[in-house]
Amino acid sequence: GFPAERIVFFEPHADEELMQAVRPDAIITKESGESGYFREKIEAARRMGIRIYAVVRPSLPPSFIPVGGPVGLRRAVERLVPGFFSLRSGFTTGTTATAAVVAAMHRLMGLGSLAEAPVELPSGEIVSLPIAEIREEEDAVVSAVLKDAGDDPDVTNGMAVCATIRLNPEHEEVRFLQGEGVGVVTLPGLGLEVGGPAINLVPRRMMTAEVRRLYAQGGVDITISVPEGREAATQTFNPRLGIRDGISIIGTSGVVKPFSAEAFVGAIRKQVGIATALGANHIVLNSGAKSERYVKGAYPALIPQAFVQYGNFVGESL
């Protein structure tokens, strides 16, 4: 084998010192990108006048599909091998809205129109969502992405989630405005400003980060709308949570797990939080609408928010 005394171990950011010690006539390196310190090696060799041979990374054949992590891998398998998983995964309204923001911002900055918008999930993984529509309106750009909830029984599945982006020189923030079909917060306890749009904190952070990638400073107004959201909201927990006139833009992980028990239990937690914020000292758990009507008659002094339906999750509710 190769003589052990001729092996010199690589130390990050010590390329020039290594080459000074070895004094090679040439170096051979592979195209390894940032993680392999490719650029640093090349720059150090050039400064010393050392000949460089780089093994170029081969192009992937069309049959290869790059993925950025477990979410992308699962989505690719679901697409290529239908039925491999019993239920398809999907994306939250927060991720969907963020994709619309990315596409609109890209166009607003004069960078053209995207067929798919890359979005960074809270986990750090990059996923891409197809853009359904993009257009310019005077001083704004409007983009729409269709919500894909996978096989989760989500009332928003297939609905257009739209983002309207405007630059606003009158302030320096990324500001969120209520659009058609997005609810307005009317009660405390959700961690959102009363009177503001029902856009949860994680989606706000996701959208803000994507805007600042392309527009580091200056005011930006983001209006999220869901044209069918007002009607869909009547089939959600929003009326109980004090969210009126539309749905919420939600999502903690950015991904919808099919038939997610987490979403139901999360809604129960929010209801309890609101009841507590309104000063309720007692919570009445009940199985559904019929039993709730009965217990409301038994406890007429309690506020409406003190009555919480547990569905199939009585243990989690307790």
Model-found features: residue ranges?
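Generic N-terminal targeting/processing segments that precede catalytic cores or assembly contacts
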Residues: F84-L241
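Active-site rim loops that border cofactor/substrate pockets in soluble metabolic enzymes
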Residues: G1-V22, R293-F313
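General beta-strand structural signal in soluble alpha/beta enzymes
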Residues: F9, I28-T29, A54, F176-Q178, ...
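A C-terminal functional module that forms or caps the active site or interfaces directly
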Residues: F10-M48, I52-R57
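Conserved active-site and cofactor/substrate-binding residues in soluble primary-metabolism enzymes
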Residues: G36-E40, G68-G72, F91-A99, D154-A160, ...
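Anion (oxyanion) recognition and catalysis
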Residues: E43-R46, N157, T276
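Non-catalytic interface/targeting segments
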Residues: G1-P12, V67, G72-L80
